[in-house]
């Protein structure tokens, strides 16, 4: 999949990343056509290129209603393009909610040293296989969930969509067939203090985690994350304004968030970027 032109365009035109823009819709269609032809599809070899990151061995798998092709959506490639644009700025990075490791492997191809966190042993097994098959040497895998404190908590596996599995209490009214088991947790503060950059997708736990941080925690780290609900968006907006951490939102072309309406309230509105700096550097 020769996505080099797409990635380059995403970097150069980052102010057009709103999902409502014509730019977004055109690039989403281009990506859809590339994915239809790719060897990442069901029944194909699972081996294809994703340029400029190189060749990838990533066999098709189903995780309930979601499959591995969904992991290559345009919003994900926007995040990949940010990794690529900033590969000379960051050294140590963390992937929180790593799933089966696609983001971690893309980070590896950017030359980062990666600490990856994923609590589901089913995902961890596949993640380890992917790391081995792709000769990734810079990824440290931690079978732990991220929260406001280090310890243990119940984890809910959503069998109909394991990408939506989460810590107990993180989501209201989880749907479908569920499995519950205990997992180790690590405090987000420990992660933020030991990395330059963090990608976080922790399925509803983001507000709880962020509320445990303070202004100093953010002095030397930046983050891109998914916000899952309007309640979490409001909580994060109010708290980060109090501790002087700036927010930049994909839904407004990565401009600085100035009101609650600028905040994403689900994955359908794109990602959020957090930093003490005055700009999101592309």
In which residue ranges do the predicted regions lie?
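S-adenosyl-L-methionine
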Residues: 1-138, 173-178, 246-282
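Short internal loop-to-helix segment that lines adenine-nucleotide cofactor pockets
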Residues: 71-96, 140, 152-157, 168-218, ...
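Short N-terminal helix/helix-N-cap motif within the alpha/beta-hydrolase-1
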Residues: 105, 125, 151, 207-208
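A short helix->loop->beta-strand "cap" motif at the edges of active sites that frequently abuts
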Residues: 112, 218-221
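Short strand-turn motif at the edge of the Rossmann-like AdoMet-binding core
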Residues: 119-120, 203, 227-228
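Core alpha/beta nucleotide-donor-binding catalytic domains of modification enzymes
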Residues: 128, 133-160
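Conserved beta-strand signature within the Rossmann-like core of class I S-adenosyl-L-methionine
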Residues: 220-228
């Amino acid at each position: 999949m020769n996505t080099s032109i797409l990635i380059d365009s995403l970097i150069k035109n980052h102010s057009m990343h709103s999902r409502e823009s014509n730019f977004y819709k055109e690039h989403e269609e281009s990506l859809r056509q590339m994915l239809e032809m790719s060897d990442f599809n069901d029944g194909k070899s699972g081996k294809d290129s994703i340029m400029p990151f190189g060749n990838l061995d990533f066999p098709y798998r189903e995780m309930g209603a979601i499959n591995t092709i969904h992991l290559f959506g345009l919003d994900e490639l926007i995040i990949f393009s940010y990794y690529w644009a900033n590969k000379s700025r960051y050294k140590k990075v963390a992937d929180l909610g790593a799933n089966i490791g696609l983001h971690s492997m893309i980070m590896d191809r950017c030359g980062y040293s990666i600490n990856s966190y994923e609590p589901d042993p089913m995902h961890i097994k596949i993640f380890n296989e992917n790391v081995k098959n792709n000769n990734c040497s810079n990824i440290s895998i931690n079978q732990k969930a991220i929260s406001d404190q280090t310890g243990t908590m119940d984890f809910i596996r959503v069998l109909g969509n394991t990408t939506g599995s989460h810590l107990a209490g993180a989501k209201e009214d989880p749907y479908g067939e569920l499995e519950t088991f205990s997992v180790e947790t690590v405090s987000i503060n420990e992660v933020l203090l030991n990395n330059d950059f963090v990608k976080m997708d922790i399925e509803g736990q983001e507000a709880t985690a962020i509320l445990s941080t303070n202004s100093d925690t953010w002095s030397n780290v930046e983050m891109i994350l998914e916000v899952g609900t309007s309640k979490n968006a409001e909580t994060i907006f109010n708290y980060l304004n109090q501790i002087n951490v700036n927010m930049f939102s994909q839904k407004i072309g990565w401009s600085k968030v100035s009101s609650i309406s600028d905040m994403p309230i689900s994955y359908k509105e794109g990602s959020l970027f957090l930093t003490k700096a005055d700009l999101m550097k592309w």
